[in-house]
Each structure stands twice: as C-alpha cells, then as structure tokens.
C-alpha cells in the first residue's frame, strides 16, 4: 500500500543521485523517525528532523508499509546488529571540520574535470588533497594543480554527481575526515587511517550531512610530471574563436577522432585542421618547438577543458611539441597536458 507524503524537496532531489536502481533496500529513502537517510553504502545523505517512520521512494515521494520492507529485506542488510540505514550514518565525534569557501568549491569542481573516468583506474578517479595543501587531479594525460587548504589531511575524494550538486547549491559547506582503525598488512598492527569524507552543509535553514568513502591506493607522484622549465611561452589565442572551432569539430569529426592539428604558417598565423577539414587560420604568435617542429596536435576535448573550463588562462609554456605543456592561470593554478603523439 502506498501513502502519499510531502517530504523536503531538496533532500529528495539530492537523494535521487544516491539511491540504487537495483532491487534491494537501498533503492528507498528511509525515515528512522528522527532523520531521513539515503544511501548506497558507499555514500550517504542525511537530514535530521521529525518524519513518519517508513521507506520512501525519492521519485514518487511515497511511503511503503514498514513491516513489508522489514520482512523482505531488513535481516539481510543488518550490520553490527544495527538497522542497515543506521549503520551507514557516520557519527562525527572527533571529526574536525574546515569551512569550504567559494574559491575551494570552484577548484574542486574544476579538478573533477581532470579525473579519470576509466573504472580500471580507480586511483586516478578522485581529487587528491596533498600534504602541502595542494588540490590535484589527473587522468594520466592532463593534470590540474591548485592551492587548497594548507592544513587539510592527505586524502583522495571521489567527486560524485551529488557532491557536484551540493557544491553548486549549498549556502554553507564544511568538510572533515572520519578515521577508522585498520590492520596494516605488512606489520599486522592496528593503524588509524582516513576512511570517509564528511560534508555538513546548509540549503537555506535546512541542515544536511553527506559522506562518501575515500579512494584508497597511492595517488601518482604528480610533482614528477611538472616540467622544471619551458623554453617557450605564449599567450592563449582568442577564446571565442576556440569555442567556434571546437563546436564545429564536434559536429564534423567522427567520435573516435578528437585530434586537432595546429600548423604554424608564419610568425603570426596558425591553421587549425583535421585531415581534409580546415577550420580556420588564426592570428597567434607561437614559435616552432626546440626541434623546429611546426605542427602541434591536441585532443580537442582536453584542450577545451584547458582553455575554457579551468579559469583565466594567462600563459602556455612548452619546449617540445611531443612533450608536456604547462598552462598557467591567473589564480595561480596550473595544468599539465600531453599533446597527441604523431608520426614524423
């Protein structure tokens, strides 16, 4: 039997990004009486308040009889003798929180663009907080490095769909690390390790908590990727021209071919093309590389992130058209990107 209920819209909208599509208990939102909980066991959203106990669909805002749900699912999902939804709620004793300002929010959103989307590369799927206060993200081809929170603990967080929404709409956000004891495989000793990232946030006067498991595994040695120096530096070309070229390339090139060729015609002109398609000859003062190559090839999708989505670009540095380029932004952030390798 379904009974219609009115529940907080912000919570239910966010919950749709967490609940599973599988036929298990975690496709529902649970009201324990004093809080609403949505979870898939890896990430959990909580809003405290007084709500009628039961299991609810975040899409239909409907309640199902609790006994029906309990009989079918409850015992299968018990953990440490706790109800399945209670066991996913992280309590915040000894968690120190750091306020997230608009600048850090924006940097986390930019960093997410640089993360790997390959399921086999989980160690590159997150945004890394370095011990020196840097925020770093890479997929192996492009990397973003920016100043973060100097005192924040070392960890790697997964920037999920719901976290992106929270970063966009929350009026206040703070985040902290939840630690847990874990056995060291080499020494067999109990050690304290970071396990979860917790975000407390407000939308208007409503208060929420979102938590997610941290990504485990060693993040790549990002410092080794940054070139010590670049022999050539150029200012970026007009962003509006780039947007027109990028839009045209999306329409005219096959999906499997993302490359754009930049051919230096003379000291002030570059032709941008792909095979038989010539998109434009633009004014851009860029010199051939140290080996006198005059053709540079870049993945258009990567270049679009570098040119239009990472902040105000003020400098592009390079030495060799087959090696890493550096992109420097007005706020001090940098990006490192590998051009596409071409046969000479």
Where are these regions (language model features)?
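Structural preference for solvent-exposed beta-strand-turn elements
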Residues: 1-344
């Amino acid at each position: 039997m379904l009974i219609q209920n009115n529940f907080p819209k912000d919570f239910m909208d966010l919950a749709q990004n967490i609940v599973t599509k599988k036929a298990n208990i975690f496709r529902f939102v649970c009201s324990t009486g004093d809080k609403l909980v949505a979870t898939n066991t890896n990430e959990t959203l909580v809003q405290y308040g007084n709500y009628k106990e039961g299991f609810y669909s975040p899409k239909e805002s409907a309640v199902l009889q609790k006994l029906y749900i309990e009989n079918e699912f409850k015992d299968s999902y018990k953990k440490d003798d706790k109800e399945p939804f209670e066991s996913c709620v992280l309590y915040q004793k000894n968690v120190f929180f750091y306020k997230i300002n608009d600048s850090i929010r924006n940097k986390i959103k930019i960093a997410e663009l640089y993360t790997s989307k390959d399921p086999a590369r989980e160690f590159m799927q997150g945004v890394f907080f370095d011990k020196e206060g840097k925020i770093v993200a890479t997929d192996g081809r492009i990397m973003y490095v920016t100043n973060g929170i100097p005192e924040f603990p070392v960890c790697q967080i997964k920037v999920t769909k719901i976290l992106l929404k929270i970063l966009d709409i929350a009026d206040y956000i703070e985040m902290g690390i939840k630690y847990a004891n874990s056995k060291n495989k080499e020494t067999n000793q109990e050690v304290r390790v970071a396990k979860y990232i917790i975000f407390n946030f407000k939308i208007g006067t409503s208060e929420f908590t979102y938590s997610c498991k941290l990504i485990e595994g060693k993040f790549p040695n990002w410092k080794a990727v940054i070139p010590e120096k670049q022999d050539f530096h150029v200012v970026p070309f007009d962003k509006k021209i780039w947007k027109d070229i990028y839009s045209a390339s999306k329409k005219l090139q096959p999906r499997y071919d993302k490359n754009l060729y930049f051919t230096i015609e003379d000291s002030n002109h570059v032709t941008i093309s792909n095979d038989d398609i010539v998109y434009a000859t633009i004014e851009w003062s860029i010199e051939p590389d140290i080996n006198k190559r005059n053709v540079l090839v870049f993945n258009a999708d990567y270049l679009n992130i570098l040119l239009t989505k990472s902040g105000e670009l003020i400098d592009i540095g390079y030495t060799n058209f087959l090696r890493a380029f550096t992109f420097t932004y007005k706020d001090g952030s940098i990006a490192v990107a590998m051009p596409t390798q071409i046969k000479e």
